[in-house]
Amino acid sequence: MEEFDKSISFDGRDIRLKIGLLAPQAGGSVLIQSGETAVLVTATTAKAREGVDFLPLTVDYEERLYAAGRIPGGFLRREGRPPEKAILTGRLIDRPLRPLFPNWMRDDIQVVATTLSMDEEVPPDVLAVTGASVAVLLAGIPFQGPMAAVRVGLLGDEFIINPTYKEIHNGELDLVVAGSPEGVVMIEAGANQLPERDIIEAIDFGYEAVRDLITAQRELIDQLGIPLVTREAPAVNETVQNFLREQAKEEIKQILSQFTLSKTERDEKLEAIENRIKETITALPDEDTLKAPTLEEPKLIGNLFKDLTKKLMRAQIIEDGVRVDGRQLDEVRPISCRVGVLPRRVHGSGLFNRGLTQVLSIATLGTPGDAQDLGDDLHPEDEKRYLHHYNFPPFSVGETRPMRSPGRREIGHGALAERAIVPVLPPQEEFPYVLRVVSEVLSSNGSTSMGSVCGSTLALMDAGVPLKKPVSGAAMGLIKEGEEVRILTDIQGIEDFLGDMDFKVAGTDSGITALQMDMKIPGLSMEVVAKAIEQALPARKHILEKMLATLEKPRTELSPHAPRLLTIKIDPDLIGLVIGPGGKTVKGITEQTGTKIDIDDDGTVTISSTDGEQAEKAKRLIYNMTRKLNEGEVYLGRVTRIIQIGAFVEVLPGKEGMIHISQLAEGRVGKVEDEVAVGDEVLVKVREIDSKGRLNLTRLGIHPDEAAAARKAATVV
């Protein structure tokens, strides 16, 4: 393919698409660039593997440190496993792509996005999303695109398309909107408690920019003469399909309308019907018109049974306005909450139950040194002081499988719940702790990520973290049949599995802090998006009321096992003095007091210990070591050595002065040893600090009040 360039501008910021330059053997490839950030995106497909009954789409996002002119650390000096940011970006690309492929497609598809160059202004993630659409179109893969994504920021009252890192950091909103010609297909957002109307306006603003990028892609493929590829859906075996309807339709409808059934009971009854039909067909001769297709396609009955169940459940919601558990469309499942469910050795814990979904969240308070260092990736963010980790063990859904490290789904759910809480954390200056919350999903029937948001809030409040406001969350669903649309509040597992949307909304009573929307259909109108956001508000408030009935406000006392933090600000030029040669001084303080000490480059010293007295002692030691001495001040010091004309006294750690023999006592002193000995504690006043910083001390003229104050304040090392 010949090289071809196309540009589109947003507020003076260009996005360039370069075709035919790189990766000629990939099915489709594009270099998408904005500023000095450039991402190569490729799409390649392979024939379907036998027995696959799902879309085997793989999206990989790769970052290379050469993109920022850096060499990786470590012995190997090459990139290792993808950081969490790369995994989340891979999910960001996958989520708007997946619903645009035909649901019957089984070909292997691999999309790879590689950041080749990166500046300090333009994030590569939204470029990679748009680039993925272009690459898929160029690869000739059946696709209901084009699709594109933009980021929307909010500075003051002004929305910005594709803000820089600095604008994102300084703004009130970080919103990514992806869309197709049909409408919005994906939303990912973090916000500083913005009201619903502002969020809706931002999504609409972003989708208008998405439409411009879609138009640009259409013009591109027209200019290149590349047709949009369509492929006929494989024919459904009507003989088997009709047999299933005759045998199972009424029974399935009856089960779906038995609202008292538990999830397990409903699943067992549906499985029994499916197994009975399979046994009936298996007993037939191989040449029978019912059995022969199932021999060619072993999963045919299971797939058709799922499709029938899906249609009947959706029809029940559309026609009757009632769900499989008997709830109304806007009704939340029963909620119960508990705090302090674990011993106080754990700093804080919260148990959140919503229907059959149960999440146990545990909060841990750490020191500034426990912050997660993000310095190895390409992004400006240095470290995280709030971490949320989400675990989804197999027993939570009654299954068995190997327990492995967190997968992409767990990382994504953890990041969403983390993003929901960050806007309400207390400022670091007021509460310098590093916070980690782990959410253990103990039972899952939908909306576990929002359960983790609620559990995290309870655990942090139980731990005594002074949150600005508590956060709750709800997952919204959608059933769309033609022009008929039904929005569901607080979806459960079967509604997520068989529905068209999973829209998670988290926030406080003042506004939204996080959004995540994924679709299974090619797009959603802004009208429906707005309605879903608005319908989530009363649900969030209802859930929040239940949470606050359990614990109205954060506890005023920390767990006795949580570290006590004290901070002191020192002159940055004195950091070396506190650390000492080879860390000798700071190690000595930590060994003497049993504390942990963290020192920031700006001179902030944080002392942590479960023993408050020892923390205070360490603070006094550092204060005395770094405080400025003034003439006329009185100190309690220790005699370190004696010479013929006087004695040297350490008044503060590392700071010595000399008392001349004439200043040791009233009247004439014959020998220094007559008045003091090495190791004696003595009260001294600073007579003079000479031009070289040397201290001249005296024991004369010290008022009793000055002496008492010096003894009280002193800590002699």
From Swiss-Prot:
The keyword Metal-binding applies. Gene3D superfamilies: GHMP Kinase, N-terminal domain (3.30.230.70), K Homology domain, type 1 (3.30.1370.10), Nucleic acid-binding proteins (2.40.50.140). Residues 563-622 form the KH domain. One of its GO terms (biological process) is RNA processing. Mg(2+) binds at D496, D502. It is an enzyme of class 2 (transferase). Belongs to the polyribonucleotide nucleotidyltransferase family. This is Polyribonucleotide nucleotidyltransferase.
